[in-house]
């Protein structure tokens, strides 16, 4: 089974560097590739990708689109079209994975399920130190991880550690609280729902819509807690409000029990 890791990014090359550095050093990952879903970043990001392409042990592909505002759904669809994996892991370009991230996702992969991961939020100070290479994040050093937590650099710590006994199928039909920064789906299921709905522009709810349509298609949710946690570098987050065009679009998907979107991997005329 070949895996494609789709990394979303927009004009934050220093954070992307930290993410790619970890993806470059994955252990027991099997066959995989990285595809950058770039929502219109400038030349600095292009240089980061080109520099990594020279030293990366697996294919590293750059899927770039023109900057026309926040178009995460479209950039992910572009990356998916260029990918060749049987199984796709979606990761944000400000989330540092552990060295066994791909390996653990591979072990969780199961036909008929998509996997949702979790994240640990990093403090602004610690994120800045990582960005400026003042310190480094050793994701395999348990002592240092606990120390970072007690120094208030992490918002939580227990979820960082692997628990093979965690019940993973309790909320099989629950689409809420999906973290778009860390989830995985089979390629055949991605195409079954026609990918991400590019009708979502601006911040929010495109991930929820994707999860709802997967569930409507009969794909169930599997929790990646205590297995594929990522470290989320600090940035100010916009809060999604349950109002506006994107929220209304999600409600329509729920009401109509929609499966395939019209404006996705394949564009359907109205």
Predicted regions and their residues:
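Short, well-formed alpha-helical segments that are part of the catalytic scaffolds
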Residues: 12-25
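Short beta-strand/loop segment that forms part of the nucleotide-sugar
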Residues: 31-41, 61-65
């Amino acid at each position: 089974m070949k895996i494609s890791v789709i990394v979303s990014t927009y004009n934050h090359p220093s954070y992307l560097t930290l993410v790619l550095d970890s993806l470059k050093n994955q252990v027991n990952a099997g066959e995989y590739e990285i595809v950058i879903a770039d929502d219109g970043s400038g030349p600095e990001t292009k240089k980061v990708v080109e520099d990594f392409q020279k030293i990366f042990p697996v294919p590293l592909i750059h899927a770039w689109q023109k900057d026309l505002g926040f178009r995460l759904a479209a950039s992910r669809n572009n990356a998916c079209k260029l990918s060749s994996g049987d199984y796709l892991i979606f990761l944000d370009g400000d989330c540092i994975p552990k060295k066994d991230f791909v390996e653990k996702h591979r072990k969780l992969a199961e036909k008929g399920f998509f996997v949702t991961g979790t994240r640990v939020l990093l403090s602004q100070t610690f994120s800045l130190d990582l960005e400026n290479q003042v310190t480094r994040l050793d994701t395999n050093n348990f002592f240092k991880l606990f120390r970072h937590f007690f120094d208030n650099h992490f918002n939580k710590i227990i979820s960082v550690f692997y628990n093979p006994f965690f019940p993973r199928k309790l909320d099989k039909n629950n689409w809420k609280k999906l973290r778009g920064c860390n989830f995985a789906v089979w390629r055949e299921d991605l195409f079954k729902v026609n990918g991400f709905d590019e009708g979502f522009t601006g911040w929010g709810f495109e991930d929820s819509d994707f999860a709802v349509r997967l569930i409507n298609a009969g794909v169930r949710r599997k929790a990646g807690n205590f297995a594929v946690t990522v470290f989320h570098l600090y940035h100010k987050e916009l809060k999604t409000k349950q109002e506006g065009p994107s929220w209304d679009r999600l409600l329509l998907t729920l009401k109509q029990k929609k499966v395939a979107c019209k404006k996705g991997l394949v564009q359907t005329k109205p």
